[in-house]
Amino acid sequence: MKIKILSTGDEIVSGGVVDTNASWLAASLLGLGLTVDCFVAVGDDFGTLRRTIADLAAETDILIVTGGLGPTNDDITAEAAAGAVNTKTILNPEALGLVTDYFNRKGWPMNPSNKKQAVLPRDCRVIENEVGTAPGFYLRISGCHGFFMPGVPKEMKAMTLNWVLPWIQRYAAKNLGRTLTDITPRTITVFGLPESEVGARLKDLATQFPGVRPGFRADFPLIQVKLYPDSEKRGGGENILDQAEQFVVTTLGRWVISREGLTMEQEVGRLLVQKKATIALAESCTGGLMASMLTDVPGSSEYFIFSGVTYSNEAKIRVLGVRQSTLESHGAVSEETAGEMAQGVRRLTQATYGISTSGVAGPGGGSPEKPVGMVCIGIAGPGFCTTKRYGFAFNDRTMNKQIFAVTALGALRKRMLMQGGSV
């Protein structure tokens, strides 16, 4: 089943508005095992829009169009759709009734311009808009099934969930002999391997599991392995996805940090909650990035206590109690200093875990002994303090800070998993 998505509006093609509708639609269709062939966006030019609708409809089974159903002069989708099938628009009584009823329910006066939203192609089927004023419509365009919906996300989503997806499921069952059930794609988060290596290790995945379509998404420094049901080769549905997921986890082993698609900070937060543990941070080279990441997670107040950006040596001494002699003998960027920082912030806050970072983010400031990309990480906990030096080959300050922060959280994750149970 071929599906294409067309988004309309000058605001989209000019870059003024990010088209989130298309990505949401694609994700919703993937849950049924359906792949979108392409996204297309056009502005508010009648001729271009009419031709685009006709051209896309000629080469697809289903065309989903969003935008251009409002009450203003630049809302021209209904007229363009009518032009694509060489018909006229009419004031649709059913659509007019829906628009009028909406205003009556709200107790609002209806502007005469809103009648334009009921002017639809002749012979179309009206799709009710339960959360807005603009009805959508279904239109057969030669052999293509066209669905036209408003561009307002909440209105488009309601129509998709209540009308479009159920229609597609019925169509597939009746005409294609397939039952499209809603199956959640699997997302496995990986850290510590480049995307090319992940792909190489999983090169046989699609062959071994023909009912699964794998995908890879890099979100530095993490990689997400996506497993989608393939509607053309559905096979065992949930069962085949479960098998493929286990194959990925077994193949990638210790590089997998989450089978639920969690980020590193989300996974660390989950473990802290599970262990009823708390965390405090002493950040130098990461400049508060770890704190920002952790507190972006809803519910982080349950485990996050404190973060101090102890950038200078004086701050390390006065706030964390790092010894002057340690700094003089080993320098700020050293495992010795990182260890004392972690112990100091844990002592200061009485947190279960104290985490520290001290490194060279670059692009300048490195030396042969301590090059750009070097970071020392300390973790202090009940009865232990461990440190480790890491080296990365990035000469970009932002990338180094990101990978330093995720590496530090990853080190804590490993430590918590090693301990098992509660702290």
Curated annotation (Swiss-Prot):
CDD domains: cinA. It holds the Pfam family CinA. It comes from the Bacteria. InterPro entries: CinA, CinA-like_C, CinA_C, Competence-induced_CinA, MoaB/Mog-like_dom_sf, MoaB/Mog_dom. SMART domains: MoCF_biosynth. Belongs to the CinA family. This is CinA-like protein.
